[in-house]
């Protein structure tokens, strides 16, 4: 159907969750990068959202700091338990951010990509569109201070311009070995894009 819709309902929340980084040691490097960057984009979208609040902004920035400091380590050395633990913690914070606020349209756009191409990993799809997506906001002069905040959280303590966020994102992608992904390697064709854009507007934007 070329649709990939998100759902949310109170009954989907577990009574108890056990997040055990020991179980994550064997996750392959590429999948670790994809899933860790999905976490990062949950945190970033939640931080930029109009629904952000003091409560989940705290979770967002803390989670982004953890991703900036530990994700590449977890990708490079899967048995680095300290790195696994901190990435898992960031992922948990991302869940708190989503459940107390709202994400932006980056996820909606990616859902269409992977609806058309089910073999496209969700995290990879987010990576493919991330620079253009956040660059659009920066070019429009939106959320200037928040982009600077996120650049600093990623490790650039001297960040002073929103563009520094894109540089920090580029470094994170490079450090995780996923900076050179292309749409064509996942079978995405330019002629599909108009239909995908229409699908986003019709099936996802109203939600």
Annotate each predicted stretch with a short phrase:
Residues 151-207:
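C-terminal charged capping/lid subdomain of soluble metabolic enzymes
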Residues 1-52, 145:
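A glycine/threonine-rich phosphate-anchoring loop and its flanking beta-alpha core
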Residues 33-36, 84, 126, 193:
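Short runs of predominantly hydrophobic/aromatic residues within well-ordered alpha helices
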Residues 46-163, 167-168:
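Active-site segments that bind and position negatively charged phosphate/pyrophosphate groups
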Residues 42, 69, 73, 171-174, ...:
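A generic structural signal for well-ordered alpha-helical segments enriched in polar/charged residues
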């Amino acid at each position: 159907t070329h649709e990939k819709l998100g759902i949310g309902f109170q009954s989907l929340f577990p009574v108890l969750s056990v997040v055990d980084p020991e179980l994550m040691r064997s996750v392959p490097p590429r999948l670790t990068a994809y899933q860790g960057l999905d976490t990062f984009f949950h945190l970033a979208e939640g931080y930029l959202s109009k629904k952000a609040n003091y409560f989940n902004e705290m979770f967002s920035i803390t989670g982004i700091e953890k991703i900036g400091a530990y994700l590449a380590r977890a990708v490079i050395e899967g048995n680095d338990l300290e790195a696994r633990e901190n990435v898992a913690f960031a992922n948990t914070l991302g869940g708190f951010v989503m459940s107390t606020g709202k994400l932006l349209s980056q996820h909606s756009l990616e859902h269409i990509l992977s609806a058309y191409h089910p073999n496209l990993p969700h995290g990879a799809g987010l990576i493919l569109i991330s620079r253009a997506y956040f660059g659009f906001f920066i070019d429009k002069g939106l959320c200037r201070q928040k982009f600077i905040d996120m650049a600093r959280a990623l490790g650039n303590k001297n960040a002073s311009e929103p563009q520094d966020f894109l540089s920090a994102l580029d470094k994170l992608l490079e450090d995780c070995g996923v900076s050179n992904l292309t749409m064509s390697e996942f079978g995405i064709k330019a002629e599909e894009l108009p239909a995908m854009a229409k699908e986003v507007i019709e099936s996802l934007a109203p939600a």
